[in-house]
Curated annotation (Swiss-Prot):
GO biological process: carbohydrate metabolic process; glycerol-3-phosphate biosynthetic process; glycerol-3-phosphate catabolic process; glycerophospholipid metabolic process; phospholipid biosynthetic process
Keywords, alphabetical: Cytoplasm, Lipid biosynthesis, Lipid metabolism, NAD, NADP, Nucleotide-binding, Oxidoreductase, Phospholipid biosynthesis, Phospholipid metabolism
Protein name: Glycerol-3-phosphate dehydrogenase [NAD(P)+]
Organism listed in the record: Streptococcus pneumoniae (strain CGSP14)
Root EC class: oxidoreductase
Chief location category: cytoplasm
Binding residue positions for sn-glycerol 3-phosphate: 108, 139, 141, 194, 247, 257-259
Catalyzed chemical reaction(s): sn-glycerol 3-phosphate + NAD(+) = dihydroxyacetone phosphate + NADH + H(+); sn-glycerol 3-phosphate + NADP(+) = dihydroxyacetone phosphate + NADPH + H(+)
Amino acid sequence: MEKQTVAVLGPGSWGTALSQVLNDNGHEVRIWGNLPEQINEINTHHTNKHYFKDVVLDENIIAYTDLAETLKDVDAILFVVPTKVTRLVAQQVAQTLDHKVIIMHASKGLEPDSHKQLSTILEEEIPEHLRSDIVVVSGPSHAEETIVRDLTLITAASKDLQTAQYVQKLFSNHYFRLYTNTDVIGVETAGALKNIIAVGAGALHGLGFGDNAKAAIIARGLAEITRLGVALGASPLTYSGLSGVGDLIVTGTSIHSRNWRAGDALGRGESLADIEANMGMVIEGISTTRAAYELAQELGVYMPITQAIYQVIYHGTNIKDAIYDIMNNEFKAENEWS
């Protein structure tokens, strides 16, 4: 692939790791953020120590606070900002951009109040004459591993296969490989909803439960994620792929996962306020839990694990009581759809 110029919006852990992948592939990378100290650190010291204490970035990766300068003559834009500000940043991009580009996003969540997928938000806020079909970049991927060039395989999903293939070629190299998919709803909901199950899996660990319980929450969590996704129009097959079960495994079993760590702390009795303050990073699973719970209620989708986590986070239900309620639900067949 010829050299491309890519704007990466969001200098967090995943945005930084993906910037390095793009730079390794010979592309010009511009990171945009709104914290001058962080941007100066990236440009001066080639580090982003809030996320990666021992990683030195290539000096060709340049960071900006000026959005217009960041977007000038770019071929593609990658959104990697928190879910709650995606719409705001998309509005800023629409007001600044003066030519058509490929639009990608690698964030995982649902808009808290509208319950909308992030690709829908980008479609609503960025006019068609300025963008391609949206491409979702998602899958089992810890930034801490990608940044040290550990093997990573994820998915590029777009309604337009050719656009997904462009992104596949843009990112893929000897340690980072993308597969394409046209099921945007499936890939996007899988990436968002697995964060909820990861919070639950972490809570089980914090409470001292063993591998049996952790395997159960992942398997049954996947079942209810699939039910909601299919109700929204996704293919059930997507949830057996990298962006589905793959991402659920990596997020629901690893200390690298901030959602798993948040759940672990909840299980050990820490308050949500203390957890968020101590982590200093966005825990997407918290806001996504409310959005998914409300969406499931609206669509009539059975999601007992999500409901239990919602009750714990937003209504102060004791975690052990929530587990007891799940274990005493009416008996069902494993493949029962409701």
